[in-house]
Amino acid sequence: MPGKQLSDPCVDCSDAEAILTLRTRRLCQTCYARFVNFKVFKRMENYRLRRNMPKTGPCKLLLPLSCGISSSVLLHILNAQIQLELAKSHPSPGFDLHVLVIEPSSISHSSPSYDEGFGLLQQTFPLHSFTRIPLHSIFELDPELQEVISQFSKDGFVDDAGLSAKERLDAFRASIPTSTSKVDVDYVLITRLVVAFAKKIACRGVLWGDSDTRLAAKTLANVAKGRGSSLTWQVCDGMSPFGVEFNFPLRDLFKAEVDNYASFFPELTRIIIPDEPPSENVLTKNLSIDELMMRYVQTQGEKYPGVMANVTRTASKLQASLTPANVPQCSFCGAFMLNSGNNGGGDTTGASRALELCYACTRSRPELTC
């Protein structure tokens, strides 16, 4: 008996109707999801097989979950891969996954509390351990930050130790003047918090949920902000200046492909906090460099996906130069300051003697207006 005739068969399996076009190829949902999974699978191979690392003992990795689409998709994919590995009679050494949620409402007042979503997370992915902390817990996990922020803003901010941790951090963030500086400072704070937590629970590495689109935007934005020297760890897989490995398993996938994958699984829609749609009425001067670059990459990526992909591929080929042991690190963002003598960011008097800032962090200080 002849098989069922398909009007638009999947080019991979030929057994189901194609529903989406993936890089010029028409695929069904199953084959589309398999493609996305495989991209992440290859990126996680070193940890799965424990290449160049001990084969026995714990190998704990931290996944910071922003509750957005990309990091939620990464968690979903890794959970499925771990389940498949555990079902084998002779599984590979593998890794343990710990998920960190920084309470969204502690980062942005417009974000809702994640109480219900956090409970759903634990129910949906019971194999893994979860922790939820507010952004202001950075004072507890990274005590050195307290001295840094009191010196960072100079006259623009006075740290009051009598206030609660939340009030102190809110006051510091409010002292940052421009939209670009606010986004930049928040990114540094979140990174420091994630790294401090990863070290606390002895994680080998951090798995960031940045897609190719996001990494391309971050590359362009960091160069524009003077953070080009940090690209070797902010967009590349490998060791960070903090002594913890940074990896980006979604780096071979475009944002649109990640979005399509998320639409296949109803359980993801219940835990994802949707991104606010970009407003068309916002003046360009009121947008941060990061927002401008993300809009640019998303719009141009639809027209020229290969060009945008090359941005990330080129950046991933960058290699950190050998850093002498005596090279200082930026007191705020942690970047190595190879040209520290000329950045103008170091304070050399009184209690501020120890504060050294890289060029980009110096530009974010409130008193700098030009």
UniProtKB/Swiss-Prot annotation:
One of its GO terms (molecular function) is tRNA binding. It comes from the Eukaryota. One of its GO terms (cellular component) is cytosol. Keywords: Cytoplasm, tRNA processing. One of its GO terms (biological process) is tRNA thio-modification. Pathway: tRNA modification; 5-methoxycarbonylmethyl-2-thiouridine-tRNA biosynthesis. It is found in: Cytoplasm. InterPro entries: CTU2, Rossmann-like_a/b/a_fold. Gene3D superfamilies: HUPs (3.40.50.620). Its main location: cytoplasm. Plays a central role in 2-thiolation of mcm(5)S(2)U at tRNA wobble positions of tRNA(Lys), tRNA(Glu) and tRNA(Gln). May act by forming a heterodimer with ncs6 that ligates sulfur from thiocarboxylated urm1 onto the uridine of tRNAs at wobble position. Prior mcm(5) tRNA modification by the elongator complex is required for 2-thiolation. May also be involved in protein urmylation. Belongs to the CTU2/NCS2 family. HAMAP family: CTU2 (MF_03054). This is Cytoplasmic tRNA 2-thiolation protein 2. It comes from Neosartorya fischeri (strain ATCC 1020 / DSM 3700 / CBS 544.65 / FGSC A1164 / JCM 1740 / NRRL 181 / WB 181) (Aspergillus fischerianus). The gene is ncs2.
